[in-house]
Amino acid sequence: MSDATAASGPDWAPNDDQQELIDTLDGTVLVDAGPGTGKTFAVTRRYVNLLRSKPIEPGDVCLITFTRNAAAEMRERILDRSEASATTIGDAPIQTFHSLCQDIIKESGFDAPQLLGIDDQITADTRVVSNEIVEETLFEECYEQFRDAHPEHAAILRTVEDPGEIQGLIGELAAKGVFPTAEGWYRGGEAALEGDREAFVERFAALNEPRNGGSKQSRLREMLSSYGDTGLHLPDAPSKASVRGEGKQLPGEMAERVFEADREPLQRFVHDIYIAYLRFALSRNYLTFGFLQLFAFVLLCEDESVRDQVGFEYVMIDEFQDSSEIQFKLALLLARTENICVVGDWKQSIYGFQYADVENILEFDARLDRFAAELNADRPRIEYDTSVDRRIELSRNYRSTASIIEFATAALTTPASGSEEVDAEAVTERLGDLETAIPGVESRIEAIENDDEPAAILTAIGEMVDNDSYAVPDGDGGTRSPTYADIGVLTRTRDFGRSLQAAADEHGLPMAYEGGLEIFRTDQAKLLLAWLRILEADADRGWAVVLERAGYDLGACEAILETASYPDAMVAFRERLRATETLPGVMRTVFDRYGCTGPRAAVLIDTIESIHANTTLTRGGLVGVIARGIEHGTTQEIHAGAGADAVTVRTIHAAKGLEHPIVILANMNSGRFPSSGGSSGNISYEEGAGLRQRDVYAEADGQPYIYRDWKTEIARKCRPTAYDEERRLLYVALSRAQRHILCTAGGRPNTFLEELPVSLEPGVVDIPSFETEAEDRPVFEMPMPEPRGPRSSTPHELGATAEAAAGPAESAGGMSFGDRVHEFAEAYALGDPVAPANDHEEAVASFLDGLSGELRPEEHVHLPLEAEGQQVTLSGIIDLLQITDEAVAIVDYKTDADRTREESYRRQLSAYYHAIAELFPDRNTSVSLFWTGSGEQTEIEPLTRAEVAGFALS
């Protein structure tokens, strides 16, 4: 158990700061909760205290988190301490913004598009597209249709190289609350596109101020030494000399000249493609996360009855530093009273690329008043007092030592480049008084550099493991020598993590890369692309990959390609693929041939099936999608459970909320961290400069050409850098450490590493012998640190031992097939207009048609258990609950081709049995398995509650 999570155990007495939050129930409350301060513990205790102290129900309290895992954890903690029933807490609005918006729309928002003048509706079966690759593919299809249908925008479209930049712009505007209507912009949103003159001029002036007391030219003038070098300006653009001026700074009037721009054609283009994308999504019966929030916001703004219906007496928002502008405004509309509590830490705001706005928490008071005034501009919507009643600081860190806290805090004032000047005084004023709860413990904080950085890291890990000099907490108040699992390697970018994983595999060090993988760059994807190309017109590129994989050298490959005399076995396999009618069939046939199994192949199949199912792309079109995915490095989350004692590797973003006894912060190299960034695309938006277009198509002097817009070139030099967020990212990485930190670089240390208060030493390369075999080290998901006292689990985990003995179930079509059958079963039970697509679904439909009573698909249940002084709460989802006056039947669908795992399913269903028996004590409860392949139903004799508890706690 970690020190940080000890503060969240049920018997842990709250400290004074936590108790203040728990007891402060009314008014607007702003909580500064630094890393390791037990905020989840305090927030969930406050929730329980609300239910005990106020005449309210769980449905009157809205608790917003930013991930489903966080919501589930909070729900479990609340359930462990609340007198409310498991069903009541299970149904309570403890969820993400996106989930809450989806509920609002499903309940009251089918006509929401019409509020924007869109003649379409959201339906009961409108799906939410959460897969980024699927969303990108759908938008590209929309973009192609738009380009063909809107020749009036041809000049702008000629300058767009990547449709993804337009998709990103739409997402950014949606997060800002800028929405189109059929005829214009919602609630004057076009004003935001014009920019903020005062803010732009102020920033321009600050950058244009001469340095060193006037003896050195301004930073802006220095940056514009390359003005005009990267693109040809239109003939009427000013010269470099006139822009930069003769002195140490740009001429004073230049700020106004740069800000003024004719944005009308660009605004019209953005409006038209934005509204076209909304219409396209509705016509395809899907919404994105951004559109969920968009329509929920419009609905709450325009329909007072909906606000009254869904409003809450108490609103609590966790991780508020991760909120966007539209989410802040949604929170105001969801609150009936001033009882709003936001909890967050500006130092950990690292999701700007997902439209999080750190100013929401830094300028909470001002934004609270401003957003309320904006919402009340045309009629009263926010009628409660928006003044902040209480500020609370959680200042006791249960995770890290004093030296680690001090070292991490230094990151917030560390320059990111040699020329950057950090306003350390302003940063220090914002810092709270974070103190350690584990005084007197020494930490090792070290830094090394070596040209062979991966080898140096492996050497360092070998030195740390089983070394008492790197002692870590043992969970009982003492210390022990570290294991591999105590070490977490964090990187700014994924590519280094993959390189390190490869080095670890080569030397036998147990290591697992966790998180986003560039799925289309895997061997599985490249093989699939090769065979799809062979089936299409681009055969040579496909054959080259396949032949190389088969072991043919370059000369042999060239000879085969030149004569088209392909090996007979490969030709036969090609014909077999041609005879395969479906794309999923082609994929599985390819993967079966090459023995591609495991999570990577499964995620790849699921991703491509989703693209195929949700778009009109042909097989040839999918070849293009995979090829672009390889080029762009599109990522997808992959998790494969593993219980190995292994070092974990993650990006810093993926490590948010986690902790490790030892943190190795790797790849601290120039150009890698801080991120060197890159072009923001041709069309971009920034609050100060407004909507801008860098490259413009024009015919100057009768010659068509794409010119560089001189005003945008200068305006982009005035944009705020992302260095503040990079510093916060550095802070997050360092504050994951409990006891020790090692920073590493590969010969080009970045400014961060050079400026941090740590001695940079030469790294040693002397890799020891490791015992673990590479094949025993799959990618896996590191669990959250386990809290003291009651823990949570799922009924599925009860069958782990039996499943391991029986081996993996042989499904009729794999996990994605099973998911589709379950989705059909849920929709059919709800009465949705769906038709069976295969024999399994036919069997499900026939089974459901024969049932009487109330049918509840996908029913969430919770079962608290206790045995030998230990506690655990099982949570799960029942496929189908059939309720009649006399009985309650639990049904679990199984697509397995055989019944070898029936015993493991018995354990799972037994947990469901006891949970439901508690809810319906006056009715007979039964459990059964429905085998979709045969249409047979098997009654299950449930285990006793004590037996279930024994398995759960074993």
Please describe what each predicted stretch is.
Residues 483, 501-502, 529-736, 740, ...:
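Conserved helicase C-terminal RecA-like lobe
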Residues 2-76, 316-317, 321-342, 346-538, ...:
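Conserved motor-region signature of P-loop NTPase helicases/translocases
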Residues 2-37, 41-42, 60-62, 161-316, ...:
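Accessory N-terminal region flanking or inserted into the helicase ATPase core
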Residues 647, 748-878, 882-883:
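Nuclease catalytic cores
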Residues 352, 447, 474-479, 517, ...:
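Short, contiguous acidic/charged loop-to-helix segments that flank catalytic cores in large enzymes
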Residues 285, 823-890, 896, 900, ...:
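Catalytic cores of nuclease domains that cleave nucleic-acid phosphodiester backbones
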Residues 58-208, 359-363:
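Conserved P-loop NTPase-based nucleic-acid remodeling module centered on helicase motor cores
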Residues 103, 108-116, 295-310, 324-328:
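Conserved RecA-like ASCE ATPase "motif II neighborhood" in helicase/translocase motors
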